[in-house]
């Protein structure tokens, strides 16, 4: 938006430039279609406006400093992004402005904070709560509407036309399913495939091939070779770095402090295990004996000589 001051011609060149120009159409307001005699003229996209005519088309609020122009209409910032933003809220289907607080999923779904509700019961979904994501219908729902597990001995067959009703805390009645709606087991597998984590969202329980609910940890962190070289070099000098030292390495490697902390804990545990293993083998070697087969705690056996020899060497370190 350009603000021009209308004043008498003061130079010959301006007189020459004005020859052949239709001043009536040039100084006519594009909004009210009236002639502009004001001292100041607002110019947008080669159109002139009265100062009082520059206001939002939707809310009619005056726009003195900044406005948005689209298809011949003037908008304030709020209504421009609401109607013409390239990013749309999956909940209310309205535009998202740069100042709005939103939840964004890796599938590309964006929700206003106030629109982040269960599509079935309308309950607001809080951060940290388990949710179901349907990126085809672009909806989210709470775990109350999670389909029941299917066992080999019981459960509705695939292609069933109904699903059981929700829990007593929900006011939603049983609703029919389309013929193409997947079975409960298929839904669980899709949740596993489309359970996206974003910010406070967490999906910890998923169904495996045997339809058992397993506790799944967070995504594994892949450490690149150059990052691993930095951590190994630091470990050789300081096996148990301070919090300040870990923070410096986090900035240097791009890894989070939590990842670095866990890496050092695992590395120290591995070093202790190797140390105890060497002592265990040396204990029998000094006596000219052949050590018995080594079994670790995750193997099924009644007694474990090596673990008894090592003691509790896997207890966690106290971090700063």
UniProtKB/Swiss-Prot annotation:
A single cellular component GO annotation: nucleus
InterPro entries assigned: HD (IPR001356), Homeodomain-like_sf (IPR009057), LIM_Homeobox_TF (IPR050453), Znf_LIM (IPR001781)
LIM zinc-binding domain segment(s): 29-79, 89-145
DNA-binding region(s) in UniProt: 216-275
Keyword Transcription: no
Protein name: Mechanosensory protein 3
Record has DNA-binding as a keyword: yes
GO MF terms held by the record: DNA-binding transcription factor activity, RNA polymerase II-specific; metal ion binding; RNA polymerase II transcription regulatory region sequence-specific DNA binding
Cell location: Nucleus
Job description of the protein: Specifies differentiation of the set of six touch receptor neurons. Binds cooperatively as a heterodimer with unc-86 to sites in the mec-3 gene promoter.
Sorted UniProt keywords: Developmental protein, DNA-binding, Homeobox, LIM domain, Metal-binding, Nucleus, Repeat, Zinc
Gene Ontology terms describing biological process: neuron differentiation
Organism of provenance: Caenorhabditis remanei (Caenorhabditis vulgaris)
Matching Gene3D superfamilies: Cysteine Rich Protein, Homeodomain-like
